A protein has these predicted regions:
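Membrane-proximal alpha-helical signals and transmembrane carboxylates
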Residues: 1-347
Length: 347
């Protein structure tokens, strides 16, 4: 079955208003049909707007009986209207269906995560976590880049939305996460950091990564990874500073096939396994320290492990976890089980 290359005509309407509800009323007086939000698939805020805070709009949306709690929250690196105007479905004939499907790519790439309105709202009200949203942008010639300045080997994951070197008729792309402190946007994570986040939070289903090739300098080995066990997290306080240990278990299938390299050799697999462990430990540690030291916000919900150290709710509340999280230190341990994903193990 082939997808249609033509999308049904859609209309983007903009209105200046003091609130979402009054804006909808104004639009209803202008168009021939009453707006129904029961099939709304995504809510888009521009970065510029999100930096000022989105709590008022969020509470209004949550209180709207028509909007489903699984509606996605997207923070656009451009104006929200520009983001909507650049939606160009190539394999779906219905724009709403396109929004629904494009956000499921997190299940097999881990470069973004499917963040619903209910998830964002719960994290906003939760004293042990901070909210985050999907990071979106526009893919066009002016934003396509041929290379990245990232120092990690997994260069394909070091992009954010509107930076990927993809030439496509699709006008929008979602890659990375928008990080919040309270209701205000404070920063962004790229695709590689998002992968680390999903491993820590046990939301990784599968992904393809590239690790440095221990047998050929300057080249990489592609690997398909999944989590074999849930990440085990332990938190304790040392001089009131949170010390967080994360034990991670992954399985990997080698996708690359290199001439002269025997993937059936135990020593070869052991070496690749050690490189995989070191690569993931470095990337995940970098992500954790970025959230703690730079953004100062706990989007991985480590607070749920800290709360058990307090005997009463008042003790927990007075500890001010959101402020203390920036003092955290981390220890990441990765244990990988690697095998060749090819029918051939030696050529």
């Amino acid at each position: 079955m082939a997808g249609s290359t033509q999308s049904q005509q859609s209309t983007v309407t903009s209105v200046d208003c003091s609130s979402i509800d009054t804006g909808i009323s104004l639009v209803n007086s202008y168009i021939s049909k009453k707006i129904n939000l029961s099939h709304c698939k995504a809510i888009v805020f521009s970065e510029e707007y999100a930096y000022e805070g989105v709590s008022e709009e969020l509470f209004t949306l949550v209180n709207n009986l028509e909007i489903r709690p699984d509606c996605n929250i997207i923070i656009s690196r451009c104006k929200a209207m520009d983001y909507l105007n650049n939606v160009k479905p190539t394999l779906e004939s219905v724009s709403a269906r396109y929004y629904e499907l494009i956000l499921t790519s997190s299940e097999y790439t881990a470069y973004s995560e499917n963040i619903a309105l209910k998830d964002f709202y719960n994290s906003l009200l939760n004293s042990s976590s901070s909210p985050y949203a999907i990071l979106g942008g526009i893919n066009n010639k002016s934003t396509q880049k041929e290379s990245t300045t990232s120092s990690v080997y997994d260069s394909e994951g070091s992009y954010k939305a509107d930076e990927t070197p993809i030439i496509s008729p699709n006008g929008i792309e979602n890659m990375g996460l928008a990080v919040f402190s309270g209701d205000k946007l404070v920063g962004e994570l790229d695709g590689s950091q998002t992968l680390s986040h999903m491993i820590i939070t046990n939301n990784l289903k599968s992904a393809v990564i590239s690790i440095p090739n221990p047998y050929s300098q300057g080249s990489t080995i592609s690997m398909y990874i999944t989590q074999s066990k849930k990440t085990k997290t332990n938190l304790k306080f040392i001089n009131n500073y949170p010390y967080i240990t994360c034990d991670i278990n992954v399985t990997g299938d080698i996708l690359s096939l290199e001439e002269g390299l025997d993937y059936s050799n135990e020593e070869v697999l052991k070496t690749i396994q050690e490189y995989t462990n070191a690569f993931l430990e470095q990337n995940i540690s970098s992500y954790l320290y970025k959230t703690a030291k730079e953004y100062k916000t706990d989007i991985a919900s480590f607070g749920k492990y800290a709360i058990k150290n307090y005997s009463t709710w008042n003790d927990w509340y007075n500890s001010n976890w959101s402020a203390n999280y920036e003092n955290s230190f981390f220890k990441v341990n990765v244990n990988s089980s690697i095998q060749s994903g090819q029918l051939f193990t030696k050529i």
